[in-house]
């Protein structure tokens, strides 16, 4: 299993986080933790794991194209 962290800058509301966690899950990743202060315009960090480097690349490609 591969673990990774994705930073979501300038989160305005929970819907922003839900959007990116959904992309990760749809691509086969498992969300382990989300760290966000709850403050508008603050960054959030999504910790996730996936099967291998190939899945990690697919997830990152989808996240970066958003």
Predicted segments, located by residue:
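Short, surface-exposed beta-strand/loop "edge" segments at domain boundaries and coil↔beta transitions
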Residues: 14, 53-58
């Amino acid at each position: 299993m591969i673990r990774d962290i994705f930073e979501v800058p300038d989160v305005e509301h929970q819907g922003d986080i839900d959007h990116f966690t959904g992309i990760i899950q749809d691509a086969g990743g498992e969300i382990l933790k989300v760290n966000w202060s709850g403050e508008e315009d603050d960054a959030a960090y999504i910790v996730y794991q996936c099967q291998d480097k190939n899945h990690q690349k697919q997830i990152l490609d989808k996240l970066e194209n958003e």
